[in-house]
Amino acid sequence: MKRASGVGHLVPFLPGLGSLLEDPEVSEIMINGPANVWVERAGKLEPHEAPGLTGAWLHRAAIHIARPLGLDPATRPVLDARLGDGSRVAICTPPAAPEVAITIRRFGGRAFSAEDLVRMGSLPEPVLEAARRTLLARRNVLVSGGTGSGKTTLLNALIELLPEDERIVAIEDTLELRIDRANCLRFEAGATHDTPVSIRDLVRHALRHRPDHIVVGEVRGAEAADLLQALNTGHGGSLTTVHANNAKSALSRLASCAMQAGDALPWEVTCRGVVDGIALVLHTTRREGRRFVEEALEVRGYDAAAGRWATAPVWGGAAELPEEAKTHTPKEVHA
């Protein structure tokens, strides 16, 4: 993906929003129109008054962002861009929207370690230890959750549990992970390449680069089949994420994605591949402005006759929790 200027370059084009663009507590700015601005600060949504922001200013901002990409909002009313500082911008202009709409997702200042997340109350200590054991045993972890639930933050923290002297190949649709490793090869998919490159293309290609561990930022489609094959053929200690409503549905979601492959195996066989490929599922959620691991399951098997996953709770749900954990109140993760 091509890059426009950093988020600081937008300040002159967005009157009344300069303080937000410079506030490290602000993770997302949502401009629905000149009189309808919302901001996510410390995990909570709140309205923001920007009296000087007009439709004309929003139009200028859209042009300023699009021009370095060789695009024109007049002919391309829906576009995505990554700014020079890693922040992401989504723009929608008329006629696709009543007014110019711009959403800015700021790139975080630093990555949180697993220990940081434990201290914040976002990652229970038993879950961290289960993840550590799983990865060091060269078994694989699936992180699930909804949009904005902290999946990427958790994934980034778990990567740091991998041995320092081993090679990581990370594959993302948009570069968001902050991986501080010398021997890490990063791939980015995208439709803006002259020759479009998909996540599935990159998962297949990654195997030629001798990875000890494969990290896929998010599985959405047929690439799940290739990833499961890799996980089941010697690339243990790998990680990925998937959108799902709970930990068990994450397993079904991963299997469903794998079934989208043109050469997909039967459902029962695919589910057995998920069982062989995934040892631990960590489900994240966001509630009342807080992001935290709500549930963790060990994957034990799949009952084809009943159509059910066999799992063992590690945290949440039916897990045996200490009394203090039952009243656990997680704090916010700003990422």
Place the predicted regions along the sequence by residue:
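N-terminal anchoring/assembly modules that precede and organize ATP-driven motor systems
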Residues: M1-P47
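Active-site phosphate-binding and catalytic loops of NTP-dependent enzymes
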Residues: P12-S19, I65-R82, E166, A261-E268
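P-loop NTP-binding catalytic core
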Residues: D23, E40, E46-A137
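Conserved P-loop NTPase
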Residues: P98, G273-A335
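Switch/coupling sub-region of P-loop NTPases
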Residues: V141, A157-G277, H283-T285
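The Walker A (P-loop) glycine that initiates the GxxxxGKT/S ATP-binding motif of P-loop NTPases
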Residues: G145
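Walker A (P-loop) phosphate-binding loop of P-loop NTPases
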Residues: G148
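Conserved lysine of the Walker
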Residues: K151
